[in-house]
């Protein structure tokens, strides 16, 4: 935790360099929160994490390839990351995500599943698509979902906005909801992130 605190302090200086304008932190509950940001660059989870209080206990999924480098794997694990295979069949990462939320800690998952290209809200020129898995994790754990907007201007001295939206606890049919309900929840989180 000492190393993490050191990184966090250095990171807060970087927020000033990147001119990050943060709004909506008052919207965040303290426990079992599932942050649902749009995904514009690889720096998004780091910038969002640095906006939060030091004791917020944020975890996030990171593509498994990043863990191939031992030094990088150690660093991102220290920052709260755990690996996910992005073929959509990684049961272990889903279990880990649910364990994080059941423990009362907080989790960041990108509804789009990957960084976007082609403009805000678009991926390769097509409208961004939300994956229903984020809603499934939220519903099964009873987590509070919070949409987050990152504007993607990650150049030094160019203003960047990070906006935390209103918290949302989804209501579904039964304990798990239908596939249509879960997709609608995921779509709504992404829509609110871009609103």
Name every feature range the model reports, one short phrase each.
Residues 1-27, 43, 54, 70-79:
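A transmembrane-helix-recognition feature enriched in membrane-embedded lipid enzymes
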Residues 22-24, 84, 164:
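Hydrophobic residues in beta-strands and at strand termini
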Residues 20, 56-58, 79, 105, ...:
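A structural micro-motif
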Residues 29-88:
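Catalytic core of membrane glycerolipid acyltransferases/transacylases, capturing the structured
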Residues 27-31, 101-102:
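Flexible, charged surface loops at secondary-structure boundaries
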Residues 17-21, 88-93:
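Glycine-rich, highly charged phosphate/nucleotide-binding loops
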Residues 10, 78-85, 117-122:
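Short, basic, glycine/proline-bearing loop/turn elements
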